[in-house]
Amino acid sequence: VSSHWDSEALYFDFSCTFDELSVDERLGPAGPTARLWEYDVVELFLRPRGCSGYYEIDVGPLGQWLDLFVFEPRAHLDWSWRSRLSVDVQLDRDSRHWAVHLRLPFEAMATRFPALKMPEIGDVWRLNLFRIAGVHPGRRYFAWRPTFTTEPDFHVPSAFGNLVFLSEDCFAA
């Protein structure tokens, strides 16, 4: 995963290899898709400074995605929030690789969290990055900051790491 930012948005690039994809082409073409975490997916959980909840963005290898705001994991979710996410996905089945480039505008985040302040150099937000890969029973779960739960569960905000805005276009994590 690589990332950067500018005055308008956050950008994340994921590069994923696979042995066997878990996708459901019946879910439709690229675009908003419910329950995407049941298939191969990359996930971004982001909590800006001062925000009590966090944003969740999931993207699959077919370009399907979902966005929501989590007030409290599994208890209080806002499915109506719209991220205005821009997603570009490349899937190469022959080389067993897929890649995601996503753009998340600050303006859209502010519609759910009006107190959002545009990041400045030195600001720290909370973040975790995930990947779910493969088919059952060999399904695998990857986390930048592992949650150490008995059953796979990424909704553990205390496990989020720090995303430090170092300079225009540069983060430290």
Mark where each language-model region is.
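Structural preference for beta-rich elements and adjacent junctions enriched in aromatics
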Residues: 1-173
